């Protein structure tokens, strides 16, 4: 697939788990695992967007591309937009915001999301999976998404709402939101 870029926003100063990108998983930093997942999708250029020189140097030392961004961004999508707006020579058709804490994601789902975006002319897309157990259902660190229809076998639905905590039992149309977003370039400009 051409004309797609995957941008991974990553920073050391996270509130819930400081230095998370540098945490070791099997003797390798989490951000390197995430970068490898993105590369293994084989859909386009991969760039890590970070305000931290330590992350930049780690990515570059491992033959990846990283750029320094402003350290004042409120969200990862703001960081992604800075790279899109100021650091790319040509503007890709699809921008994938792949969260820097997803080292176990199957690279094929990134490819599936990009293919769906192109085939269905979507402006914005994201992924969801089944909520596996009661603990995940109650965990405020697990973002849930409520959709307008049952999603099975790579089907797609419209997101109705996103939330972390619910005071009532979850609807059967509530799923575990996966932290990856795809935008057309026009949608990213409108969103940010």
Where are the language model's segments positioned?
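Conserved core of the sugar-phosphate nucleotidyltransferase
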Residues: 105-192
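Active-site donor-binding loop signature of nucleotide-sugar glycosyltransferases
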Residues: 27, 69-71, 100, 147, ...
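Nucleotide phosphate-binding site architecture
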Residues: 23, 56, 189
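Short, high-confidence coil segments that cap the C-terminus of an alpha-helix
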Residues: 43, 90-92, 119-123
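Short phosphate-binding loop-to-helix
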Residues: 47, 53-115
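Hydrophobic/aromatic residues located in beta-strands of well-ordered beta-sheets
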Residues: 6, 46-48, 95, 125, ...
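N-terminal glycine-rich phosphate-binding loop and ensuing alpha1 helix
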Residues: 2-50
């Amino acid at each position: 697939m051409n004309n797609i870029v995957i941008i991974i926003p990553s920073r050391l100063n996270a509130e819930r788990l400081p230095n998370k990108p540098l945490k070791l998983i099997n003797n390798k930093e989490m951000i390197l695992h995430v970068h490898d997942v993105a590369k293994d999708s084989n859909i386009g250029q991969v760039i890590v967007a970070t305000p931290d020189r330590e992350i930049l140097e780690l990515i570059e030392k491992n033959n990846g591309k990283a750029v320094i961004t402003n350290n004042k961004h409120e969200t990862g999508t703001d960081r992604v937009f800075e790279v899109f707006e100021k650091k790319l020579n040509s503007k890709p058709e699809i921008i994938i915001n792949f969260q820097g804490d997803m080292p176990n994601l199957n690279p094929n789902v990134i490819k599936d999301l990009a293919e769906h975006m192109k085939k269905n002319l979507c402006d914005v897309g994201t992924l969801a999976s089944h909520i596996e157990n009661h603990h995940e259902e109650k965990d405020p660190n697990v973002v849930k998404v409520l959709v307008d229809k049952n999603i099975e076998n790579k089907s797609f639905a419209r997101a109705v709402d996103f939330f972390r905590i619910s005071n009532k039992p979850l609807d059967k149309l509530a799923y575990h939101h996966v932290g990856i977003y795809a935008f057309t370039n026009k949608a990213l400009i409108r969103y940010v």
